[in-house]
Curated annotation (Swiss-Prot):
Zn(2+) 2 binds at residues 107, 143, 360. Catalyzes the hydrolysis of N-succinyl-L,L-diaminopimelic acid (SDAP), forming succinate and LL-2,6-diaminopimelate (DAP), an intermediate involved in the bacterial biosynthesis of lysine and meso-diaminopimelic acid, an essential component of bacterial cell walls. Homodimer. This is Succinyl-diaminopimelate desuccinylase. Pathway: Amino-acid biosynthesis; L-lysine biosynthesis via DAP pathway; LL-2,6-diaminopimelate from (S)-tetrahydrodipicolinate (succinylase route): step 3/3. HAMAP family: DapE. PROSITE patterns: ARGE_DAPE_CPG2_1. It catalyses: N-succinyl-(2S,6S)-2,6-diaminopimelate + H2O = (2S,6S)-2,6-diaminopimelate + succinate. The active site is at residues 76, 142. The lineage of its organism: Bacteria, Pseudomonadati, Pseudomonadota, Alphaproteobacteria, Hyphomicrobiales. It is an enzyme of class 3 (hydrolase). Belongs to the peptidase M20A family. DapE subfamily. Zn(2+) 1 binds at residues 74, 107, 171.
Length: 396
């Protein structure tokens, strides 16, 4: 059986490509070469949108019959900041003390390397006729606007007749140790600006002005007075946070003309953006009455809450993780949003990857042992998802 590259070698190769979003940096080209050499058909479509950079993406597939397992991720990374603050060059892929250092080691070039290493080893042993299909869907637009990436790549694939049965997105899901957590859903995110209107005037003549600040305090209090919900079996309670309050008034002797607050809600699957906006307006109208003039501007959002119901596929992934790590992972929907919100429109999706403690930080790094174990977990998943047929003698 031919030797296939280790997850460490693949991760180093990806990290050494400076693919700071939206730059491709050679990362997709590197991955495309590996997959093409293993027999995948590979395409690299570029998508555009007004006001956003053009972004290159990758789609690769091997096999035509049977179930299709989609393996997804992104090769773009956030900027490293000041390189002098790093122990090693953030794009050198240095191993020190059993850890691989570099931007993207955790989020998420390490995860992609493990998906690729597992797939290449699986194909080297089983060959191309393994009773199904494996597809890679990798974008260079996840850390940026997320406009010309996964959402368009999925639409492009769908228009070509591509269909997927299940997906693994290799985001760093584990809080402390490999095997801690699988993400089976994500909360939605909604941002809105609340503006209370007043009338500017001199503070010494308040009867000639209308101060919007008391009205803003009143309306903000109404939004926070009662919880939005109590949560569900798989989701925490929805949470509203004010992130800024501002009047844009540098003068201490002037009553401002308006006061503004920005809020963000991370919501569970009891809500959608329309129903959540309706609830906000209901609370605001009740508190404002005829005394407070306000405007609520809700930003469009594509981050809607979703849940992949625990089923046989989730059980298969859980069993692979437990067999390799000895830990039974929690099924969680915590944290921020991810490209899983787009993939769930194509097929059931779960997220599992590395330990996320150093993602987006200076000296981002991952234990080499975790790369090996994550690749082993993915290999177990592939073996279970595409079980080998018994030899003819055993079938008889």
């Amino acid at each position: 059986m031919p030797t296939t590259p280790s997850p460490l070698a693949l991760a180093q190769g990806l990290i050494r490509c400076p693919s700071v979003t939206p730059e491709e940096g050679g990362a997709l080209a590197y991955l495309a070469g590996l997959l093409a050499a293993a027999g995948f058909s590979v395409e690299r479509p570029v998508f555009s949108a007004p006001g956003t950079p053009d972004v290159e993406n990758l789609y690769a597939r091997i096999g035509a019959d049977g179930p299709c397992l989609l393996l997804a991720g992104h090769t773009d990374v956030v900027p490293p900041g000041e390189p002098a603050l790093w122990r090693h060059d953030p794009f050198a892929g240095v191993v020190e003390g059993g850890e691989l250092h570099g931007r993207g080691a955790v989020d998420m070039k390490g995860g992609i390397a493990c998906l690729a290493a597992a797939s290449l080893a699986f194909l080297a042993e089983r060959g191309p006729a393994f009773g199904g299909s494996i597809a890679f869907l990798v974008t260079g637009d996840e850390e940026g606007p997320a406009v010309n990436g996964t959402v368009k790549l999925l639409a492009w694939a769908r228009a070509r007749g591509e269909r997927f049965d299940h997906c693994i997105l290799a985001e760093p899901t584990n809080p402390d140790a490999l095997g801690d957590m699988i993400k089976i859903g994500r909360r939605g995110s909604l941002t809105a600006t609340l503006t209370v209107l007043g009338a500017q005037g001199h503070v010494a003549y308040p009867h000639r002005a209308e101060n919007p600040i008391p009205g803003l305090i009143r309306l903000a209090g109404a939004l926070l007075a009662a919880p939005l919900d109590e949560g569900t079996a798989h989701f925490d309670a929805s949470n509203l946070e004010f992130t800024t309050i501002d009047v844009g008034n540098p003068a201490s002797n002037v009553i401002p003309a308006q006061a503004r607050a920005v809020l963000n809600i991370r919501f569970n699957d009891l809500w959608n953006p329309a129903s959540l906006e309706a609830e906000l307006r209901r609370r605001l109208d009740a508190a404002a009455g005829n005394a407070v003039r306000y405007r609520l501007d809700v930003q469009p959002t594509n981050a809607v809450a979703f849940l992949t119901q625990p089923d046989a596929f989730v059980d298969l992934v859980t069993a692979a993780i437990e067999a390799e790590t000895g830990r039974r992972p929690a099924l969680s929907t915590t944290g921020g949003t991810s490209d899983a919100r787009f993939i769930k429109e194509a097929c059931p999706v779960i997220e599992f990857g590395l330990v996320g403690q150093t993602m987006h930080q200076v000296d981002e790094r991952v234990a080499v042992a975790d790369l090996d174990r994550l690749a082993a977990i993915f290999r177990r998943i592939l073996d279970a998802y595409f079980p080998a047929s018994p030899p003819p003698a055993e079938r008889a």
